[in-house]
Amino acid sequence: MLTLKKSMLLLFFLGTINLSLCEQERDADEEERRDDDEMDVEVEKRFLPLFLPKIICVITKKC
């Protein structure tokens, strides 16, 4: 009975460690995704001011 309790306690302990490691990895993945989204927004902000005057010029034909 004592051996069974020890092995169950060990399994519970290892499972808890595994769960916490998975949560940390998931959090890190979410942060990476969030960083990629922020980079995309920055690229869009830099892209629009460069080509917006040219697009307006082509549309209005007042170049």
UniProtKB/Swiss-Prot annotation:
Q: Kindly list the cysteine pairs connected by disulfide bridges.
A: C57-C63
**UniProt keyword Signal present:** yes
Q: Which InterPro entries match?
A: Frog_antimicrobial_propeptide
- Designated name of the protein: Jingdongin-1
Q: In which organism is this protein found?
A: Amolops jingdongensis (Chinese torrent frog)
Q: Which residues cross the membrane?
A: none
The residues the entry assigns to the signal sequence are 1-22
Predominantly, its location class is: secreted
Homology family: Belongs to the frog skin active peptide (FSAP) family. Brevinin subfamily.
Arranged from A to Z, the UniProt key words for this protein are: Amphibian defense peptide, Antibiotic, Antimicrobial, Cleavage on pair of basic residues, Cytolysis, Disulfide bond, Fungicide, Hemolysis, Secreted, Signal
Q: What does this protein do?
A: The synthetic peptide has antimicrobial activity against Gram-negative bacterium B.dysenteriae (MIC=35 ug/ml), against Gram-positive bacteria S.aureus ATCC 2592 (MIC=4.7 ug/ml) and B.subtilis ATCC 6633 (MIC=9.38 ug/ml) and against fungus C.albicans (MIC=18.75 ug/ml). Has no activity against Gram-negative bacterium E.coli ATCC 25922 but exhibits low hemolytic activity at concentrations up to 200 ug/ml.
Q: Name one Pfam family in it.
A: FSAP_sig_propep
Per the UniProt entry, the propeptide covers: 23-44
Q: Where in the cell is it found?
A: Secreted
List cellular component terms (GO): extracellular region
The tissues in which it is expressed are:
Expressed by the skin glands.
